[in-house]
């Protein structure tokens, strides 16, 4: 098995949300749309050193980028996907569980044989030593490993240096480098990274996945099996300065900035414990990564949107990290064959978070104050 190598270029989609009036019109159109794809297909080339590719901006066909566009974003599973129901093995092969001392902490997303992305806030008040973290892929059940499971040690954790410098949860993105490259199989595949200037169609089908809590009873811990939820994203402009709620403490009002953040407009089931997990959209050729679950209000306040890190904003940073980070030494990779401990939702702060109901968020009272939390 070889050592982990960097990638020269990474690109992602530019996705922003519309002004109030435009949002209402676009939302009405989306709610009545029935032309959303509900199947995925495609063949999977194998190989431990294959790299995730970019999706071409001008087309939704399988345009080759560096000859590897047939690798990423194409699960083996073919069939309908139902929101809120357990995922099937191989259905979301880039979904990873980030383990902290053997317990599920956050979601993460495989973007290359040696790299995953997650969110910086997952590491707040936690040890920064990579030896305390592992990633689990090829698994849809956290308590039960199969022959498809790969559990890998983390070599390096790189959090964004500007996290919360400009506004709360700003630059909420982190990268994880593995000691050894992940072997791509029918159950472990990287997600595609779209090009910077690609425009998503208005009826694109987008999904969020994770093991987060499905109820407000946070004592129950995360669910055992990965659960997908459907989300329809609006691709427009004008997300600046939109107030989505209030935050207790030193920040009395929470403002969503277009710089590096997305907000959800559609109902779904993104909950506590899903932080760092993927928001992916399906094009005719493959699934592409659009956002990372960052934060939201708890289930008692459904009128507020959940917030995602807009990955496209960090394209240069991601590219630089993957190009310039030193290679890991495979001889130093620790043994990682032990089964995971029973999960206890490590470090999860309080009750669950849910996506906003689309028909209510545009009429939010600006004076309402509600508790905030990470997802």
From Swiss-Prot:
Query: What broad class describes the main subcellular location of this protein?
Result: secreted
Alphabetized Gene3D superfamilies for the sequence: putative rabgap domain of human tbc1 domain family member 14 like domains, Trypsin-like serine proteases
Q: Which residues are glycosylated?
A: 183, 203
Q: Which residues form the Peptidase S1 domain?
A: 81-323
Span list, region Disordered: 41-60
Q: Which residues form the signal peptide?
A: 1-23
- The protein's Enzyme Commission number: 3.4.21.-
GO cellular component, alphabetical, reads: extracellular space
Tell whether Secreted is among the UniProt keywords.
Answer: yes
* Broad enzyme group: hydrolase
Pfam families (alphabetical) = Trypsin
Instruction: Note the SS bond partners.
Output: 106-122, 206-281
User: What is the protein's given name?
Assistant: Putative serine protease 47
What species was this sequence derived from?
Answer: Homo sapiens
């Amino acid at each position: 098995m070889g050592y982990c190598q960097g990638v020269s270029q990474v690109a992602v989609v530019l996705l922003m949300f519309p002004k109030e009036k435009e949002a209402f019109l676009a939302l009405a159109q989306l709610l009545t749309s029935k032309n959303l794809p509900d199947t995925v297909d495609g063949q999977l080339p194998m190989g431990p050193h294959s790299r995730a590719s970019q999706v071409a901006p001008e087309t939704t066909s399988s345009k080759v980028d560096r000859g590897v566009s047939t690798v990423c974003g194409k699960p083996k599973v073919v069939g309908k996907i139902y929101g809120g129901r357990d995922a099937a093995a191989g259905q979301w092969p880039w979904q990873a569980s980030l383990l902290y001392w053997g317990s599920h902490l956050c979601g993460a997303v495989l973007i290359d044989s040696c790299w995953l992305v997650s969110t910086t806030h997952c590491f707040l008040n936690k040890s920064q030593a990579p030896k305390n973290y592992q990633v689990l892929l090829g698994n849809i059940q956290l308590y039960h490993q199969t022959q498809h499971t790969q559990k890998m040690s983390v070599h390096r954790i790189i959090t964004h240096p500007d996290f919360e410098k400009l506004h709360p949860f700003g630059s909420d993105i982190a990268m994880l480098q593995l000691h050894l490259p992940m072997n791509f199989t029918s159950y472990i595949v990287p997600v595609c990274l779209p090009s910077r200037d690609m425009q998503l169609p208005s009826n694109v089908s987008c999904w969020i996945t994770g093991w987060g809590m499905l109820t407000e009873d946070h004592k129950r811990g995360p669910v055992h099996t990965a659960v997908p939820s459907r989300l329809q994203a609006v691709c427009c402009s004008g997300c600046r300065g939109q107030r989505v709620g209030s935050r207790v403490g030193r920040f009395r009002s929470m403002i969503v900035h277009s710089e590096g953040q997305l907000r959800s407009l559609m109902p779904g089931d993104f909950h506590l414990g899903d932080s760092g997990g993927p928001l992916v959209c399906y094009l005719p050729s493959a699934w592409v990564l659009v956002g990372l679950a960052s934060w939201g209000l708890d289930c008692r306040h459904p009128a507020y949107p959940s917030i995602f890190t807009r990955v496209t904003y960090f394209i240069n940073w991601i590219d630089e990290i993957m190009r310039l980070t030193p290679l890991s030494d495979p001889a130093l990779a620790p043994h990682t064959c032990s089964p995971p401990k029973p999960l206890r939702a490590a470090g999860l702060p309080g009750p669950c978070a849910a996506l906003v109901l689309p028909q209510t968020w545009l009429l939010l009272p600006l004076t309402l104050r509600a508790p905030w939390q990470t997802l």
